[in-house]
């Protein structure tokens, strides 16, 4: 995803330009995958962070794909008696439910924070601190 798109997503999520929240964002991503891209950044307060930014339109694209899969599953269950082997409609719905939760970065932020609390009991475990006030449905900010 182009850096300009990252800045557009951040501005849309925060309701202000990214440079009002971050002192610096490295334009080169640390990593990139099908759902999101991660960039190294520095907050205005000086902390080094990682910003995970969801690709625009990823939910809409998946919704179209799932709609097609629903139609195929419906047709397949009429032609092939697969209900004795696997519930195709159920599999498609489970896929969609999982995808929806994975694309809500507020859920991811809460899970990270919960794991950090859990891991605090163990000296050999650690988890990045989440900056909850900077997390949205499409952005996660962590140390």
Functional labels for PLM-detected ranges:
Residues 1-143:
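Broad phosphate/nucleotide-binding scaffolds in NTP-utilizing and phosphate-metabolizing enzymes
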């Amino acid at each position: 995803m182009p850096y300009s798109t990252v800045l557009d997503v951040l501005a849309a999520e925060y309701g202000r330009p990214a440079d009002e929240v971050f002192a610096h964002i490295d334009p080169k991503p640390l990593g990139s995958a099908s759902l999101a891209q991660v960039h190294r950044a520095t907050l205005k307060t000086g902390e080094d962070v990682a910003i995970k930014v969801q690709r625009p339109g990823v939910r809409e694209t998946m919704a179209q794909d799932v709609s097609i899969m629903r139609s195929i599953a419906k047709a397949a269950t009429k032609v092939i008696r697969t209900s004795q082997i696997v519930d195709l409609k159920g599999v498609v719905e489970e896929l969609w439910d999982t995808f929806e939760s994975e694309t809500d970065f507020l859920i991811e932020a809460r899970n990270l924070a919960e794991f950090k609390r859990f891991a605090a009991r163990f000296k050999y475990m650690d988890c990045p601190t989440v900056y909850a006030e900077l997390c949205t449905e499409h952005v996660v900010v962590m140390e």
